[in-house]
Amino acid sequence: MDFGVQDIKNIIPHRYPFLLIDRVSYIEPGKKVVAYKNVTSNEYFFQGHFPEMPVMPGVLIIEALAQAGAVAILSQEEFKGKIAFFGAINKAKFRRNVVPGDTLKLEVEIIKIKGSAGIGKGTAYIGEKKAAEGELMFMIGDKN
């Protein structure tokens, strides 16, 4: 199953300039997702981080993982039409710089759901090498 940007926008509320995933190549609703972010030299954050040596901010890599995780959890039947709120990040590690031209592969596995709260383990890759990883805590709520 391959989701494009419009499909993603039908699941999560994020929009430009804060929608940080471009494509979903695999989804097991409520369990696992594989998504991608194509990092280009036109990204707004490169204007200030850093103009002479553009590097994607680590917090935005984590946010991209959180958005991918939100697609996984909000695709589960009982959570369709809801919104996922980022609760916490634990054990975050940044292993390599993400620069223009890179394609981030974002893998998130939902490891625990209890009621409307849960935890996902996210890993971002460039090729086969880890760029970042962490545990993402989230809450599911109503849009209104």
Swiss-Prot record:
One Pfam short name: FabA
The record's section on SUPFAM superfamilies has: Thioesterase/thiol ester dehydrase-isomerase
As its record notes, the protein acts as a catalyst of: a (3R)-hydroxyacyl-[ACP] = a (2E)-enoyl-[ACP] + H2O
Keyword Lyase included in the entry's annotation = yes
Name of the top EC class for this enzyme: lyase
Q: Where in the cell is it found?
A: Cytoplasm
Describe the task this protein carries out: Involved in unsaturated fatty acids biosynthesis. Catalyzes the dehydration of short chain beta-hydroxyacyl-ACPs and long chain saturated and unsaturated beta-hydroxyacyl-ACPs.
Q: What PANTHER family does the record point to?
A: 3-HYDROXYACYL-[ACYL-CARRIER-PROTEIN] DEHYDRATASE
Q: What is this protein called?
A: 3-hydroxyacyl-[acyl-carrier-protein] dehydratase FabZ
> What organism is listed for this UniProt entry?
Clostridium kluyveri (strain ATCC 8527 / DSM 555 / NBRC 12016 / NCIMB 10680 / K1)
